[in-house]
Amino acid sequence: MLWKITDNVKYEEDCEDRHDSSSNGNPRIPHLSSPGQHLYSPAPPLSHTGVAEYQPPPYFPPPYQQLAYSQSADHYSHLGEAYAAAMNPLHQPAATGSQQQAWPGRQSQEGSSLASHHSRSASLIPHISGLEGGSVSARREVYRRSDLLLPHAHALEAGLAENLGLHEMAHPIEEVQNVDDAHLLLHDQTVIRKGPISMTKNPLGLPCQKDLVGVVMNPSEVFCSVPGRLSLLSSTSKYKVTVAEVQRRLSPPECLNASLLGGVLRRAKSKNGGRSLREKLDKIGLNLPAGRRKAAHVTLLTSLVEGEAVHLARDFAYVCEAEFPSKAVADYLTRPHLGGRNEMATRKSMLLAAQQVCKEFTDLLHQDRTPNGNNRPAQVLEPNIQNCLSHFSLITHGFGSQAICAAVSAVQNYIKEALIAIDKSYMNPGDQSPADSSKTMEKMEKHRK
């Protein structure tokens, strides 16, 4: 509506100018010679140009030369020449050559009518400002608010940001984005997968979300059942593998890859075996990166699950306790040290010291609290020594510490038998000669045979 008012004002001014020029004997358009040709509406001012989105119909059909409309750099051109000059006189576009040729008489009249334009525009500015809101809202599709106020756009945005507090809101948003990016960078850094996984139901039947940030939701859950490797065909037994055990196999010190873990779990080799295993582990919250390299040397114990390794250690302890020939070894090793009371006393003191050392060693191993199977006992030892014992136990899948305890127990049984033999010899009369003692030893050997 604003540009219509502007055109009406300019039309009245042009009619007055044409009337003045005709009264002085100077016609408005001198090169028209045809009497039947009618006069057309005056041309728009030189500064009035259209926009790319809306092309108004030309005011002057043939034989007049048609104006070449171009995109103006003036952002106030839709308000008209007078108002654009009053608002921003530094942004007036220069007249093109075609405009100067089409309207030669108009240029001579610009200077005379400029003063009257400014005076009338000053009186119309209050009315136009009142209509500005409606006109701009009606032409939102053609002009944006930032385009109309382009010279002051940065200052306006700064003022809005200051009044609305947008500059304070931008910093928390950026911090949240940085935290999310930093959280995404943790991918493949640990065995436990970060972030929430699929919904499951707890024992009460209520859905709960596994938000795995450093822990596995249910470590005691059975992941699969694995047949034993060392059992006979007639007594094949299966061992349950828990989620916690799988996590220990993927964590240091072993860091098994998909191929080795599939062998431990007795999974048949297939084309997509590694991918299916990774997907199954991902469902329980464990991360197994593709192309991973193992960290520890592979041994026969690597192929055993913890249940079978512990079973093997218990059987080994039973065999050591029941079948190891502790008495025969003690008698054989004690015979050379029965020459005299002093020698037997020295030997006895050495055996007592060894017995004390073995007792301290086994007591330390019995205090090992490395998690195994479903057992997660509380730590008793200091963290530095417990970490070392846990490293050995994890490498051997729980077999190592129990097997060493069984072996040291066999050594302790030998020491007990050796002390008994020395005590028997010490209680005998000490007047025996070396020859008699040698004969006694020969008799003992024959008796053993």
Swiss-Prot record:
Q: What induces it?
A: During retinoic acid-mediated differentiation.
Give the start-end ranges of region Disordered: 13-58, 94-130, 426-449
**Which BP terms does GO give this entry?**
cerebral cortex development; dichotomous subdivision of terminal units involved in mammary gland duct morphogenesis; epithelial cell differentiation; epithelial cell proliferation involved in mammary gland duct elongation; forebrain neuron fate commitment; germ-line stem cell population maintenance; hair follicle development; inner cell mass cell differentiation
Q: Where is this motif: PPxY motif?
A: 59-64
Positions carrying Phosphoserine? 251, 433
Instruction: Kindly list the places in or outside the cell where this protein is found, as annotated in its UniProt entry.
Output: Nucleus
- Name the domain of life: Eukaryota
- Region annotation (H-S-H (helix-span-helix), dimerization) maps to 292-423
Q: Where is this chain compositionally biased, Basic and acidic residues type?
A: 439-449
Coiled coil residues, start to end: none
After translation, the protein is modified as follows: Sumoylated on Lys-10; which inhibits transcriptional activity.
Task: Output the Gene Ontology cellular-component terms.
Answer: mitochondrion; nucleoplasm; nucleus
Listed InterPro entries? TF_AP2, TF_AP2_C, TF_AP2_gamma
Question: Tissue-wise, where is it found?
Answer: Expressed in lung, ovary and testis. Expressed in most squamous epithelia. Also, detected in several exocrine glands including the prostate, the preputial and salivary glands, serous glands of the tongue and ocular harderian glands.
Q: Where is this cross-link: Glycyl lysine isopeptide (Lys-Gly) (interchain with G-Cter in SUMO)?
A: 10
Function as written in the Swiss-Prot or TrEMBL entry: Sequence-specific DNA-binding transcription factor that interacts with cellular enhancer elements to regulate transcription of selected genes, and which plays a key role in early embryonic development. AP-2 factors bind to the consensus sequence 5'-GCCNNNGGC-3' and activate genes involved in a large spectrum of important biological functions. TFAP2C plays a key role in early embryonic development by regulating both inner cell mass (ICM) and trophectoderm differentiation. At the 8-cell stage, during morula development, controls expression of cell-polarity genes.
Q: How does it assemble?
A: Binds DNA as a dimer. Can form homodimers or heterodimers with other AP-2 family members. Interacts with WWOX. Interacts with UBE2I. Interacts with KCTD1; this interaction represses transcription activation. Interacts with CITED2 (via C-terminus); the interaction stimulates TFAP2B-transcriptional activity. Interacts with CITED4. Interacts with MTA1.
What is recorded about the protein's domains?
The PPxY motif mediates interaction with WWOX.
Which family does the similarity line name?
A: Belongs to the AP-2 family.
> Any idea what this protein is called?
Transcription factor AP-2 gamma
Species: Mus musculus
Taxon lineage: Eukaryota, Metazoa, Chordata, Craniata, Vertebrata
